[in-house]
Amino acid sequence: MVKENFIYVGIDLHKETHTAVTIDCYNQKLGEITFPNRPADFPKLVTKVKKCNTDAKEVVYGLENAYGYGRPLAVWLIDKRYFVKDVNTAISHRQAKHRGAMYRKSDSDDAEAIALATLNMLDKLPDACPNDAYWSLGQLVHRRDNIMKQRTRLVNQLHEQLCIAYPSYKQFFNDISRPTALYFWEHYPSRKYLKGKSVEDLRTELVPVSHNKCSTKTCEKILDAVASDKVKNNAYQDARDMVTLSIVSDLQHYDSQLAEVDKMLEQMYKMLGCTLTTIPGVNVITAVKILAEIGDIKRFSNANKLAQFAGIAPLHLSSSGKGKDVATKQGNRRLQATIYFLAIQMVQVSSKGTPRNSVVRAYYEKRKAEGKTSQQALICISRRLISVIYGMLKNGTEYRMPVVENAGEKL
């Protein structure tokens, strides 16, 4: 693509309005427009750009995060057969800071920085591909993340209540949010509700809930721990019991929501025909998180561009003939974190000394032997995983475990 043959439109996206700035290949500002974020008003943008485009050149639109507030506009522009590029926020911010002697912050300045980033990185920026399937998958993944955050807060609140009502609660329930534990807190929010309960009574009640996993020994442990705590019945215990019951009810609700979301995620994963779960250590949840961030793999022409998008490609810094590779601070942080966490999981070794993934572990040890730190070796694994994931998504192939002797060459 010859840059002189295009004009560039950078669009700063917001919930209610968008601001667009048009520049030419020499970074001369040609025009600006602010328009509502409604499909009925999108033609105003094209009309304004046509007035600025006196030489009838091709137009390239750069959208900062084309999968959020700008998704309807990206879909509309693509349907009109325009070139649409997805500009990472970190890239446009860097352009804004280096544009002049004084850093300015406004919608117009941001839009101009996005246009400049589109001009300077025309061949490196990924095409915007707001596919409905991947967008819906991303919505489900974000919903699941929000549910898990809320659930974690509720579990912490439940810990706060239980440490007063049952000081030794960790002796009989290691996981206080599993179904059996939630049933117990729901029916026995404080020790006064256990008065008169025998071991057999408690076992008869908990066995069906735990699917026959709650033994007589566990029930004895519960009653013995409660008796040994010698907790006095404090004033206003009923009010605190109500708080416990409310937290348990919320946890049960979120667990139900989580099960529904996970079921839908599994259905969508199968519908997309993905093969990422054939990689050892990758389950459906990890796979859909990766898919939601990458989107349509066709928008990346090679694995290097995907690595750059994820912020995993090393950045080379050098001066006077000396240099080193460092981790970049740009890219999709969510995708980067998912891949890095996956790399950590794949190099783990069991208590018996058996590696979870012998090939990845051998590659990790090879990099460590070359003098790299653990973090640098994990980044190397992350970069290899990006290439593996790219090839699998591009070709629809399953993961094939290579021979350990060749692990230093490929994963």
Question: Which stretches of residues belong to each language-model region?
Answer:
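A detector of single, family-specific signature residues
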Residues: M1-L411
